[in-house]
Amino acid sequence: MIPSDHFTRFYNEVFKFLEDQGEEHLEAYWLEISKNQEKHTLELFKEKGLKGMYEYWDHIRIEENCDMDLKLDDEKLELRMNVCPSLSKVLDNDAQPMKRYCDHCAGWIGPLIDKVDHHLVYDVIDRNKPQCVVKIFKDKEKAIEEEKN
């Protein structure tokens, strides 16, 4: 198995290559990642909704040793990535990070969340700092309101 620090750097280079081929190629790749993730998450998210999403990202937090806070209530799941291990590894590299590296998360998470009739709000905060906030809402109107903020 490839070590995660090598994997994220490889991913970064693949993203740059695909972006050079055209935006549609990059988005198609992210959609394929999303389809693959369905095998691990779709039924859990359908059956348990926000609670299932919390369970999934809580497992990821432990498995990937993420400095991440998860907050769940009846209306939304908030994932606050304090230090993203993926972007941290990409930044700790002699190759330049893809400018939109962080967009790959929304690129695979978004289509999956849409399939379970929930709504994603993604705040990258700063593309040069390994942190972001993801909020997943049950109610579309609440997600739209959050995006305005």
Task: Describe each region flagged by the PLM.
Residues 1-103, 119-127, 131-133, 138-149:
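N-terminal accessory segment detector
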